[in-house]
Amino acid sequence: MYRLLSLFVLVLPLGCGSSGIPVAKVSGRITYLGLPVANASVSFVPDKIGTIPALGKTDADGRYTLNTYGASDGAPVGWCRVAISLTGPPPPLPEHLAKAEAAAETMQMPGKPLIPKKYFSAETSKLKVEVKSGSNEFDFALEGDLKP
């Protein structure tokens, strides 16, 4: 009985994050109008309340790998809503503000959206996936009327 309990204690943490919520490897590719989306932020927001989202960033080819508790550990297992955001560089500050470096850093406005803003929020993107145990590959082909 002691051996069985010891085995259970050793196996239980496998595939779980530091909070005990299981995570699974997640990667994929994001394109917009058929072109790779580089430098986009990717978030998987779990439907399960109290579960932290998984985050990632796309490379030059639009590929991403998600992190929840550690590097490339994946996303929480279960249904997740997806948000993808990408903006251009922030607009220049007016000269009178740019002189004060501290003010310039704290007052930077976000840049122009480079993909449709509906994808910026997990509530409005309409992208939803089920993360399952093991490895998961989710590609997203985004559509819209913004020119790439």
What is each of the regions a protein language model found here?
Residues 1-14:
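Sec-dependent bacterial lipoprotein signal peptides
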